[in-house]
């Protein structure tokens, strides 16, 4: 039953949103095994400046009826993407790679991460993801990008 619900999400979500979720999943899947584990969530949370305890981590993963692969991740978190703070969450995921706090990342670095982490993006997926992305001078503006994919039209947080 969970598999049916999870696969149904793929037909309901816009392709852009699925691509963004794939990118988020890849960033969270720290050990690159195709599944988000308690250790992955702990590592990403610590990088974002928050250290949840084991009880919190267990509660986060409890929503999944089994191992949290990409399809299950989509099923559980896609509803949260339409909420008011989802854009902030996406920006924060990008921001963890933005050591200079410029709100821009080297596009080649982002592409390298997506090609070599978790759900390795192929060339077509990469082209689709960045087709209309705000890139200027080799810098990817993740604030504009998240506003664009979320449809908020806002360029600043």
From Swiss-Prot:
Keyword Chloroplast set for record: no
Gene3D superfamilies tied to this protein: EF-hand (1.10.238.10)
Molecular functions per Gene Ontology: calcium ion binding
Record keywords, A-Z: Calcium, Metal-binding, Motor protein, Muscle protein, Myosin, Repeat
GO-annotated cellular components: myosin complex
Keyword Ribosomal protein tagged: no
Pfam families: EF-hand_7 (PF13499)
Listed SUPFAM superfamilies: EF-hand
Additional remarks: This chain binds calcium.
Protein name: Myosin regulatory light chain, striated adductor muscle
């Amino acid at each position: 039953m969970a598999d049916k619900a999870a696969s149904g999400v793929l037909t309901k979500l816009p392709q852009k949103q699925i691509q963004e979720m794939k990118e988020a999943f890849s960033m969270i899947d720290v050990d690159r095994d195709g599944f988000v584990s308690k250790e992955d969530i702990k590592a990403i949370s610590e990088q974002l400046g928050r250290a949840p305890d084991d009880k919190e981590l267990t509660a986060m993963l409890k929503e999944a009826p089994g191992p949290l692969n990409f399809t299950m991740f989509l099923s559980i978190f896609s509803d949260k993407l339409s909420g008011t703070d989802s854009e902030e969450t996406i920006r924060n995921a990008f921001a963890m790679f933005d050591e200079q706090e410029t709100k821009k990342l080297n596009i080649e670095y982002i592409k390298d991460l997506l090609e070599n982490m978790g759900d390795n993006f192929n060339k077509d997926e990469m082209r689709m993801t960045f087709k209309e992305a705000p890139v200027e001078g080799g810098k990817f503006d993740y604030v504009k990008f998240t506003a664009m994919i979320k449809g908020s039209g806002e360029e600043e947080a």
